[in-house]
Amino acid sequence: PVLVDVTKDVTGAKYEYNACTPAAITPKVDTIKDKDIETAVQMIKDAKKPFIFTGGGTIISEASKEVTELAHRIDAPVCDSLMGKGGFSGEDPLYTGMLGMHGTKTSNLGVSGCDLLIVLGARFSDRVTGNTKTFAKNAKILQIDVDAAEINKNIVVDASVVGDEKEVLKRILAEVPEMRHPEWTAHISE
């Protein structure tokens, strides 16, 4: 252990400095495979009870607009992780709150009852999943993440797309039609 003791006069002093902002890392778009997009689009089209789980990747990718457009296009409720807070508006009628042990009953029951869980830039931490054997056991899981190491890491998924979330969603949105699930969204909003 090391102790760095900074005196009060130094911490309270005013000084000039030049802020150093690291350059953002731009993920490669060419990692996105056409067949993975096709699979994702088909899973979304086949879903009767879709649910979106968004995480910190939405924030990093600046994909809030695309997540909102997808949610409204496919009529899917949206929950988030702590790292995903702000990636989808808390004022939106499709928003259900956080998922997991610190989450809402609506989000947790929604994930338990959905037939397709679309995971956007979120890892499956133990605070979100609880028992991994029973997490979203009735759902197919589609995971979209820039980090291939996160795919199937804690939860085995049915399909995945590796790539920048914003770019992946743009490609999915180009192919997904307007869909309505009135019974499902009514059930979630109860």
What are these regions (language model features)?
Residues 13-19, 62-66, 89-94, 128-132, ...:
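Short acidic, glycine/serine/threonine-rich loops at helix termini
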Residues 32, 41-117:
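Anionic-ligand anchoring segments at beta-strand to alpha-helix junctions in alpha/beta enzyme folds, i.e.
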Residues 100-151:
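Phosphate/diphosphate-binding loops
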Residues 3-7, 53, 119-121, 145:
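Short beta-strand segments
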Residues 6-12, 56-58, 148:
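Glycine-rich beta-alpha junction loops
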Residues 19, 42, 47, 138-190:
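Phosphate/pyrophosphate-binding active-site segments
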Residues 3-5, 75-82, 142-145:
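Short internal beta-strands
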Residues 1-46, 182-185:
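Conformationally flexible catalytic loops at phosphate/diphosphate-handling active centers
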